[in-house]
Amino acid sequence: MDMDAKQAVIAKLDELKINYTLIEHDPVYTIEEMEKIDIENVDYIVKNLFLRDAKGRQHYLVVADKDQKIDLKTLQDKIGSTKLSFASEDRLQKYLKLTKGAVSPFGVLNDETAEVEVVFDKNLVGRSCVAVHPNDNSATVVLSYEDLEKIVKANGNTFKAIEL
């Protein structure tokens, strides 16, 4: 069954009995564009960085509050990685089957071998609302941090919540 990216995410949310709100909107590619959309939960938007280590052997999906500053050098020390850099679009497609502008924690659902480690901003822990793309930048899903974590666990990816 060939579902589009958004429908696959919605199906997984329903399968795991997760409460969420789906908001449809024009495609957005940046946090700035996202903030211009008239949605109630604009304060709960997260940004997502897809990173790789120096040798390209380990990949990380960093999920942080949209206003959180992230220093890659500090982050690499905190997660015990070699030099971090942004992964290429080819790697993004290979591991998460996503394109630039649609990066999302739900990308782990496409990581069939659960190779990508998810690093959550500790400031997200306990939030009742987190707003993320459902692997499609023309919609936003609002759900709790706990439920977002449940998705990552269900896929088998390792994850941690650290202070960024």
Swiss-Prot record:
One of its GO terms (molecular function) is Ala-tRNA(Pro) deacylase activity. One of its GO terms (cellular component) is cytoplasm. The keyword Nucleotide-binding does not apply. Keywords: Cytoplasm. It is found in: Cytoplasm. Coiled coil: none annotated. The keyword RNA-binding does not apply. Its main location: cytoplasm. Signal peptide: none annotated. Belongs to the PRORSD1 family. Functions in trans to edit the amino acid moiety from incorrectly charged Ala-tRNA(Pro). Has weak activity on correctly charged tRNA(Ala), tRNA(Gly) as well as tRNA(Cys), tRNA(Met), tRNA(Pro), tRNA(Ser) and tRNA(Leu). This is Prolyl-tRNA editing protein ProX.
